[in-house]
Amino acid sequence: MDDPSMMPDLSHLSAEEREIIENVFKRQKDEEAKETQISQKASEELSELDKQITERKETSKKLVGTQDDAICQICQKTKFADGIGHKCFYCQLRSCARCGGRAQSKNKAIWACSLCQKRQQILAKTGKWFQPEEQPQPKISGSEPSPSPQPLTDDNVPEPQQRRAEPPDKMNTPNYQNNQQPRGMGMQPNHNQTQQNFMNQNQNSNQHPNQNHNQNQMQNPHQNQNHVQNNHQGANNHQQNNRRAMQQQPMSQNQANQINQMNQNQNQQQSHNQNMTQNQRNQTGPQNQQRTNDSRTMKQTPQQQPSQYQNNVGAAHQHHNQHGQQEQHHQQMNEQRTDNNRMRENTNGQGGMFNRQPSLEQTTPMNKYNHVEDDGMNQRPTFYTGNSENDQRQFDGQMQQGSQQNNQNQNQNNRNLRKNTVSRVTEEDYASSSNFESKKQRNNSSQSQSNTQGVRACPSTDDHLNRVKNRLHRQLRSMSSSEEDIIAGGGGNTLKMSTSAVVASGGKTAFHDDMGASNVQRLSEECNSEKDLLRYIYGDHKNSDSSSLGAGVGGSGGGGVLSGNSVLKSKSHALLKGSYQGGLDMQANRRRDKSLSLSPSRNDHFGTGSISGGDLLASRIRTFLSHPVTWQPSADQKKLIGHMILHRTENSAANGDLGLKIVGGRRTDTGKLGAFITQVKPGSVADTIGRLRPGDEVVEWNGQSLQNATYEQVYDSIAASRYDTSVELIVSRSAIIPGGDDFLNLTPSQMSSSAYSRVPSAYPSQFQRQLPNPDLFLDIHPALQQLSLPHSQSAVFPHNNTLTSRNRSTSSYYYSDVPDLGVPSNREMQESQAFGTGHIFGRIEVSFVYSHHDRQLSVALVRGFDLPPRSDGTPRNPYVKIFLLPDRSEKSRRQSAVIAETLMPVWDEVFYYNGLTEPMLLQRVLELTVWDYDKFGTNSFLGETLIDLASVPLDGEHSLMCILVDMDDDNPLRTVISIFKFHVIILTFLQRLKLRKASYNAPTRRPQSELNYYDHSSNYYDHISQNIDKQPHHHHLAPNDEENDEYIDDDELENDIDLATGGGARKSRTYRREKGMHGGHGYADWTQNHQRQSGYTSDHGYGRQNMIGRAYNRRQQRRPRSATALSQMEREDMYDPTRKHRDDNEYSMRESVRHGSQYYLGDQPLYEDGRYKISQGQMTPKQHNQQHQPHPLSQAHQQQQTAGVQPQHHQGFQQQQHPQQPNQQMQQMQPPMPNQGYYSDGSETLSVHSTNSMPTTMTTVNRRNMNANNTSNDNTSFAETPTANTNRVPIKETKQNSLASSSSVAGGGSAANNVMKERKKSLMTRFIPGRGAEGKRTGFARSEEVGIPGNLSSDRLTEPTPPFLKQASKESTDSAHSDKFARQCWLPVLADGPLGTFVDNLGPGQVVGRQVLASPVLGEIQIALMAGRSGIDVEIIKAKNLVVKPGVKVCPAPYVKVYLMEGKQCIAKAKTNAATKTTSPLFQQHLIFNDSPKKKTLQVTVLGDYGRMERKVFMGISQIRLEDLELGSQPLIGWYKLFHSSSLAGTGPVRKDSDVSVGGAQQ
C-alpha cells in the first residue's frame, strides 16, 4: 500500500502471510478506484442528462402558442391527432411513443421519456436514487424567517438571534443567563463613552447631525441588548455594571448620581413587577422570544430610518429628545412612588438623559415603530407630569438643562413658548397616565401580563366607555394623526406617526402651530358621544385652510404654518422644515403626543385626585390613541384600509391564537383572489384591539401580500407566523358598514366637505374604483396634491393634455388651425366624461425611443404586473398586441410572445416602426391590448391602454401604464382616431371622385358663422365641418356630371377607403353598443351622457357620438372579452323592430353612394345648423320614406311622418329637428361598412391584401331581386354569374333597379317570393363566398360573417323562408370572402339552423356544411339518442353501406368514436368496441355522457381497423346538434349520413351569456 497509515502492523507475520494480506489490500484499492471511476462517469452522465432535459424544457416553452398540444415536445413533430399526449412523470414534457414509454415506478405504471428513464436507471444503479447527496443544513432553524439579509453565521448573527436559536429550556436556565452577562457588561463602557462623545459633538458641531445620527444607530443594538440582559438580573449586578462603566470612562458626578438612581429605580420596578405577576417569572420563554423579536426588529432600524429629521433639525433637538426619552423611562419605572420621591428622582435624572435604557420587557404595543426611531434624534419624550408648581418648575429646569448646550437665543424663545403650555401638558399627562392606567391596574390585575406584551384589554368596569373609546380611537387616529405612508416590504414595515399636538387644560384644548400660536376652544357641557368629542377636538371649521382648527392638524411643507383641512395629512419630515424657533417646541409637543400614543404599556399609576372635564377628555383621547391601529379611506372612498399590529398575550402566544379565522382563495368583486376573515373570537385581541369583523379582507399579513393568493398560500403565510409575538395586518373593509358605523364619516353628505373630495371628485370614479395596488395611505396635503393622484391617472391625463395644447401646435395636416379638438372647456365636465367605464386590472411597463436620424420608433415591452387570474384562479397565458393607430393593418400590427401561466409576465421585447417623421409621430396613438392565449378556446381579452406618443418620453424612460378593461370609445384618444379615420375616408372618397369626374366648379366658401350652430357642444361637429370646408378637393358636383361618366369602380373606391382606414374593419369587443341611448337612428352630442355605469358591459347610455355615422361605427365595435357576448340591453336592441328600416336605409344610401348618386360631401347647401341639404330628387323613394320612419326618441314627431312611397319631386324635404339627424346625414354619406358579429381574437385584424380579392356577388344577387318585380320572366338577369366583371354597374340601370326593388319590398312583392322559392337552390349554390377568388388564408373568419344577403332574408319577405346556416370549412377561412363580402352583408349573422332543404334524408338534428354538395355519402349509421337524469345516452346501433379504402380488398373492423362538443371545445369523448370486419357492422353499444345537451353537438366518427396495416382509418363523420332535438326518456332513433370531414358545419365561438343568437328573432 502506498499509504502506510492504511496498512496494519504486519511485522509479526511471515513474508508469505504478509504478501497475501497486501494483495488483499491492493485488490480492495483497485475496486475502490473502479467504483470511484464508475461513480464519476455516472455523475457526468447525470449532469449531461439534466442539461438536456433543461434544454428541452426551454424549447418547449417556446412552443406555447403554436398548437403545442399536437406536437411532441421532445422531437417537435406533430404526433397527436386528438391533441392528447402523455406527459413524462418526471419532466412533465409531452412525448410520443418514440420519445418515451411506459415504465414501472414502485407500484404503478407511469409514462416517462427516454431521458428520464435513463436518468432513473443511473440513479438506481449508483445508489443516488435512495442516497441523495447531503445538503448543508442551515445553522439556524425555526419557524421564523431571518429578518437580516446577511448570511446567518456565528460571526454576524446578533446576540438576540443567537439566543433565539437556543432551545427555550436552555434560555430559561440561570446558567444560560449568567453566561450572557459578561458580553453585555463589556458593552456598557462603550455605550457610555459613545453617549459622552455624542454630547460633546453636539455642543461643538451643530451643523453635522448625520454623524451623530449614524453613531447612535451603530450603538442602539448593543444598548438594547444590554437592557434585555440587565432586566434579568438583580440590583447588585446593575450597580456592578455601572461601577465598571464609570471606572472605564470618567463621567461627571451628576451623571454618576443619575446612573445610581436609575439602577435603584430599575430594582424597585422589577420587584414590583415580580410581586404583581407571579406567572410572568415562570413564562420567560415567550418573553425571551418577544425580546429577541424586538431586538431583531431593532436591527432593521439603520436601513429604515429616514434622514429628514437629522437634516432639518439641529443637535438641540437630539438632546431634547434624549431627555424626553429618559423622562418617559422614569415614568414607566416609578409606579408606586410618592410625589417627593418622584420629584427627587426626576431631578437626579436630569444629568443622565443620555443613558437611554428603556426596558424592553415593558415595551411595547408598537415595538417596531418604537425601535425604528430609537436613535438619538427620534426618541419620543414623555414628560414627567404632576399637579404641583414644583413639577412645572422641574419641567422648565429640565428643558433649560437640555437647552444650555445649544444656542442661547433659540432656547430663550423656546423657554418663553413653553411657559404657556407647561400647565396644560402636566395636567393632560397626569390624566392620561393616572386615571385610566391606575383603573386598569385596580380592576384587572391580570392585565399586567397583557400590558407587558403590548396588548391592552378594555376596562371591564365601563363597557360603554370602552366601546366609545375604541371607536373614537380609530376616528382620531385616522383624522388627527399625521401618518407617514406605509411602506410595505419584506423585511418589515415601518410606520412613522406624528400626532398633532392636542393638549387640554381645565376645559380647553390648544392646537399649536409651528410658530407657537395657539387657538383655544371651550369644551361644551354635553360631551357624551364620540361625535361630540370630535366636534370639541376639531371644531366646526371644516374647510378652513389657514386656521389651525379643523378636522385635523398637519404641518405645511416649509411654511411652518399648520393647515386645518379635513382629514389632512402631512409627512413627518415636512413638519421639520418650518422655522427653527417654533419647530423645536412643535417637535417636542408632537413627540410627546407620539410617545403617549405609541408608548410602552405603563403600569404606573399616581395618586388619586379630582379630574376635571378637560383632563377626562384628554385622558380618553390619549387612551384611544394608545393602540397601534389606524384606519384610512381608500382613494375611491369606498373602502377602509386598516393597518394594525396585534400582539399575542402570554396565554395565546403558546397556541398562536389571535382570535381570527382567515380563509384564502376566495373570489373578490374585482375577480381577483383574496383572503377574508370568516370568524372573530369575542374578547380576543382581534376583537378588542383590531376591531376586526367577519368579511374584512386581509390585504397583507406580516408584510406578505395575500391578494391573488390561493388557499394553500394563505395557509402557509399564516402558519409561518404562528409563533410570532406580534402580527402586522393590513385589512380592507367596505366604507358603508351595516349598522351605521361609518366612523370615518364617508357618507355622501360629508364627502363634499372633506379634503378627499378635492382630489378625486373631479376625476372619473371608474379610475379609482379598481386600483391595482392602491397606496393605502395617500398623502393629500394641498402642497403635495400632485403626488396624491392615483397612479392610474398617469395613463390618462397625459392624453388629456395632448388634446388641449400639445398636438395643436404641430404641423398636422388635419389639425392645423383647429382649436381644442372636441374637449369642453369645463375641466370637470371633461374629466368626468372623457373616459370610459372600464375596470383597471394590472399595469404594463413600456418604454419608447425615437431616432430622428432613422425616423424609427422603438417600443420596448418590458413586463406586466397584477394581471387578473382566470375565474377558476389559474394564471393566464398573456401576450400583447400593438397597433400604431389609426393604422390597423398588418403593417402596423406587432405581437409579443406568449408567456405561459403567469400573472406577472416578463417579455423584454422590442418592436420597431420605421418611416415615421416627427409630425407623424405626434399624431399617432399606440394601442396595447393584452390577451390571454387559450389553446382550447377563444383567446380572452384582458384589457388595453392607449398611449399618446406626443405625451410620453421618447428617450427610453420606462413608464407604467394601467390596463383598462373595456375602454370605451368616448375616450378622447379614440375620438381623435375616429376623426382621423373620417378625414382619410372623406379625402380618399373625394379624390376618387375627382379622378372620375370630367368637370368641377370652383369651391364656394361659406362663412364661419354657419358652422357654429351647436354652440353648446360639439367642437367635433364644427371641426369636421371646418375641415371638410377647407379641403381643396371639396368641389360642387354639377347635376350634369352624372352624364359624363357612366361607371364608378366601386371596388377600387372601397378598397382605397379600406386601406386608408387601416386595411380592414376593426373587430371590436362588444356588439352594437352605440344604440343604447339613441336607438341607432342617429346620435346626439357626446356630452349629453353624464352618468356612467360600471362593469364590463356598460351598455346603458353611451355618450360617444362619432361623426362617421352608424355605418362607420360598425367598424368601430368593441372586442369580445373572452367568450362574453351581448348584455340584455344589446340583445333587446338587436331585436329592435326599427332595425329593418335602418338596414334598408343604409342599403339604399349605400347603393346611391357607390353608383354615383348626386349627393355627396362636396359643397352642398347647408342648413343654418351646418347640416347638408339633400334634395328629394337625389333620394330614392325608399330613402325618403326611411327619413321619416319613427324612432324611439322621436315620439313627438310620429304624427308628422309619412307612410308609403312619396312621389318624386325636387323640393327640399322637411327635416325633423332631431339631435341625431346631422349624424344621420353623415351616415348616408359614408361608404359601406360591415356589420360585424362576434369575433375571436384571431379576427382582430384583416389582411391588407384581403380586400382586393372580394367578389361583388351581393351586387348581382341584389340586381336579381330588383328585377324580379318588373320582369318575372327575365331569366337572363337572374342567370348572371357573380364574377369580377360585375364590378362595374351602370348607374342608370342601378337607379331603376333600386327604385323597383324599393317599391317591391315596400309593397310586399309576391312575385319575388315565388321566384325565391323556385330559385332557392340555384341561388344558394351561386352564393358560396370565395368562388373564383384568390387570396391568402387569414385563418380567422370561420363562418361568422357568412349570412343571408339582405334581399333574401326572411324579415324582408312577407312569407318567411327557412333560415340558412352559416357554414365553416377550410375554405371559409380564406380571405377571399371574409372582408368585402362581410362589408356587403349588412344584416347580422343568422342563427345556426338545419341546411337540410337541399340535402335530403338527413338524420334528426344532423347539420352539414356546404361542401356536402360535392361530397359523396360514405355510408349511414343508425343512432338512438336519449336524455335522462344521468345525462345523454347515445346508442350506436348499426351502420350500413360503409366505403372501404380504395385498393384494399380486406374489410376493416369498424368502430365509432363519439365526441361531445361545446362550440370548438371537446367536452367528453367515448368509443365503441370494434365490430366484425364488414361494411354493415352491428354495434348495439351505449355511450353515456354526463352533461346537459344544451349548446352541445355530437360528432360521430366511424373509423376502421385494418389490423397491422392501419388501425385508425377514417370512414365517415356525422354531426348532430342536440339543441335542435327534444330528447327525453324515449329514444330518438334515426339514420345519419356519413360525409367527409370537410363537410362539418361551423360552430363558431360559444356565446355563453346569450341563449339565442342574432337571428333568433326570426324563429
Curated annotation (Swiss-Prot):
GO molecular function: small GTPase binding; structural constituent of presynaptic active zone; zinc ion binding
Tissues where the protein occurs: Restricted to discrete puncta in synapse-rich regions of the nervous system including the nerve ring, the ventral nerve cord and the dorsal nerve cord. Localized expression was found in the head.
Composition skew (Basic and acidic residues), residue ranges: 25-35, 326-345, 1129-1154
UniProt feature, compositional bias: Polar residues: 172-182, 356-367, 379-389, 1086-1097, 1242-1255, 1278-1288
Residues annotated as domain RabBD: 7-133
Region (Disordered): 25-50, 128-466, 582-605, 1054-1163, 1177-1311, 1346-1373
UniProtKB keywords: Exocytosis, Metal-binding, Repeat, Synapse, Zinc, Zinc-finger
Stated name of the protein: Rab-3-interacting molecule unc-10
Segments passing through the bilayer: none
Superkingdom as given in the UniProt entry: Eukaryota
Organism expressing this protein natively: Caenorhabditis elegans
Chain positions recorded as Zn(2+) 1 binding sites: C72, C75, C96, C99
Domain C2: 840-962, 1417-1536
Cellular location(s): Synapse
Regions of compositional bias (Low complexity) in chain numbering: 190-284, 300-316, 395-415, 1181-1230, 1256-1277, 1297-1311
Comp. bias intervals (Basic residues): 1112-1121
Gene that this sequence comes from: unc-10
UniProt record, GO biological process: defecation; intracellular protein transport; locomotion; locomotory behavior; mating behavior; positive regulation of multicellular organism growth; positive regulation of synaptic transmission; positive regulation of synaptic transmission, cholinergic
SUPFAM superfamilies: C2 domain (Calcium/lipid-binding domain, CaLB), FYVE/PHD zinc finger, PDZ domain-like
InterPro entries: C2_dom (IPR000008), C2_domain_sf (IPR035892), PDZ (IPR001478), PDZ_sf (IPR036034), Rab_BD (IPR010911), Rim-like (IPR039032), RIM_Znf (IPR054386), Znf_FYVE-rel (IPR017455)
Listed GO CC annotations: axon; presynaptic active zone; presynaptic active zone cytoplasmic component; presynaptic membrane; synapse
Record function comment: Regulates the efficiency of a post-docking step of the release pathway. Acts after vesicle docking likely via regulating priming. May regulate the conformational changes in syntaxin. Binding of vesicles via rab-3[GTP] to Rim may signal the presence of a docked synaptic vesicle. Rim may then signal to unc-13 to change the conformation of syntaxin from the closed to the open state. Syntaxin could then engage synaptobrevin on the docked vesicle to form SNARE complexes and to prime the vesicle for release. Not required for the development or the structural organization of synapses.
